[in-house]
Amino acid sequence: MRVAVEGLAHRFEGTDLLFENLSFVAEPGVTIAICGPSGCSKSTLLSILAGWEQPYAGTVTREGVDRVGWVFQNPYGVAERTALDHVVFPLLAKGMSRREAEPKALEAMELFDLEYAADRRFCALSGGEAQRLMLARAVCSRPNMLLVDEPTAQLDTRTSHSVSHV
């Protein structure tokens, strides 16, 4: 797996460039942090890296990337579904049986210290628990590219530190 970005630029129609001449290479196992103030188009860049948006200029080459995990800036979920239902969902969507999917989902939840919350409804989770749940959902299908947008924004310092090591 390798992601190469060359001369990337982007703007929305009728606006100035949001960023320009951005180039980097992400090799397997490398973590890249994209930092900047609110509104500087970090989320837009992630959408381009995922292939959801086309850049204004430049190229993104994704070699060997066939499974992308994504964690949005704000945790979204179905209020009445359980935490386990949320993590199992992407596995079921790929055709796995619930019997096969549940152990994998619980393993991902354990990575983020959420095994205790498996039967809790999404609406009963704290903001930090919901954010960690979205991280568990993103990693349960073993993506070879993981994009996270403000992954620790709703987490306390201790939890934020432990999440960054996963």
Q: For the regions a protein language model found, what residue spans apply to each?
A:
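Helix-to-loop junction immediately C-terminal to a conserved catalytic motif
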Residues: 50
